Design a protein with these regions (language model features):
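Extended extracellular/luminal ectodomain segments enriched in beta-structured repeat modules
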Residues: 51, 62-69, 218-223
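Extracellular beta-rich ligand/substrate-recognition surface
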Residues: 42-53, 200-206
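Extended, solvent-exposed segments with strong compositional bias
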Residues: 44-46, 110-154, 258-271
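Sec/Tat signal peptide C-region and signal peptidase I cleavage site
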Residues: 19-23
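C-terminal edge strands of extracellular/lumenal beta-sandwich accessory domains
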Residues: 24-31, 56, 84-103, 134-252, ...
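Bacterial N-terminal signal peptides that target proteins for export
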Residues: 1-9
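Bacterial N-terminal signal peptides
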Residues: 8-17
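N-terminal leader/pro-regions and domain N-caps
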Residues: 24-48
């Protein structure tokens, strides 16, 4: 369904602009997303997960030669942080891939792939059920040799892929990641980043109002984008901000349904991130799915650290000179 395109020089320039950022928490604190979520395979899709799988890519700068680690917070499903629908009965696998095809393989970046088998070389897979020793604790993949990641020229780095998949059960597994240079602490990989092409996450509950931020990146070939979202329950609004957009509204979905809306892209938005602001006043948490495609139906990435920095609207101020 999706066609894959290279991003040419704009992605590289934006990545270099973002390099000083050091926090590789996923979700990143600046996004204000509560947690990632993946439901068990027997779950009702109306609970907010369309395919019971989630893929994240982790980018290592080309200069990195020391080992890196991908840490998973609360990987089990059955504790106080998870969405249990009764007695805990859910297993979740976390599978790590590297090498050729990890990023470039068929449908590797497709948010709704017809072939669910991940591409790349499987480095390690770990399955978790209800395991108290991991409740609210960290599990670490690694050490990872940076040279085991697939080279991605347009990023000037190498990429690993971590796929979370709900295997059995009907509970929601809430978890987070951290890209680290330490197996026991969260120490950021300088110049690293993480990104996904389909984001399944939890909007936090609020007593008044809360806003989360998603940062899709726009390469220099994009003329228009289509945002697609699933199961928002008509419980949030979407406003799009960028250097050229000052809160343009987007369409949001109802319960158990997909919806979408299209936005034109200005030339000055190329090589920068957009700021999708989702605002909710719902007193209960809400799980949902988001992805963005361009005019060719090619998926665009959401970066944890927005490439080019957080976008800010640029006002056009006309100045008249009186002689």
């Amino acid at each position: 369904m999706m066609k894959h395109m290279f991003w040419f020089c704009s992605a590289t320039l934006a990545l270099l602009a973002a390099a000083p950022a050091r926090a590789q928490a996923v979700p990143n604190p600046g996004e204000r997303v509560e947690s990632l979520i993946t439901f068990g395979a027997q779950s009702d899709k109306q609970w907010g997960d369309d395919d019971f799988a989630q893929t994240f890519f982790f980018l290592i700068p080309e200069r990195q030669r020391t080992p890196v680690y991908i840490r998973v917070w609360d990987p089990d499903c059955g504790g106080k942080n998870d969405d249990l629908k009764g007695a805990a009965n859910t297993t979740t696998s976390f599978s790590l891939y590297g090498g050729p095809g990890t990023f470039s393989g068929p449908q590797a970046r497709d948010p709704r792939p017809t072939n669910p088998v991940p591409t790349g070389r499987l480095l390690k897979s770990q399955t978790f059920g209800s395991e108290p020793q991991y409740d609210g604790k960290w599990y670490t993949f690694g050490p990872l040799n940076p040279l085991e990641g697939e080279p991605v020229d347009e990023f000037k780095g190498r990429v690993f892929k971590l796929v979370a998949r709900g295997l059995t059960g009907n509970d929601g597994n809430l978890y987070r990641y951290f890209f680290s240079t330490s197996p026991t602490e969260n120490v950021s990989v300088e110049g690293g980043n993480a990104f996904t092409y389909e984001y399944c996450f939890r909007l936090p509950a609020t007593a008044s109002k809360t806003t989360v931020h998603l940062y899709p990146f726009v390469n220099d070939k994009v003329v228009s984008i289509k945002q697609s979202n699933y199961d928002v329950d008509n419980a949030a609004t979407l406003s799009v901000f960028s250097i050229a957009k000052n809160g343009q509204p987007g369409t949001m979905s109802g319960d158990g349904e997909w919806t979408s809306s299209v936005f034109p892209i200005a030339n000055k938005e190329h090589g920068l991130s957009l700021d999708f602001r989702l605002t909710s006043t719902k007193p209960a948490p809400n799980d949902l799915v988001f992805y963005v495609t361009d005019q060719y139906d090619t998926a665009l990435p959401f970066f944890a650290i927005p490439l080019g920095g957080r976008p800010r609207y640029q006002y056009d101020i006309g100045v008249k000179i009186h002689r």
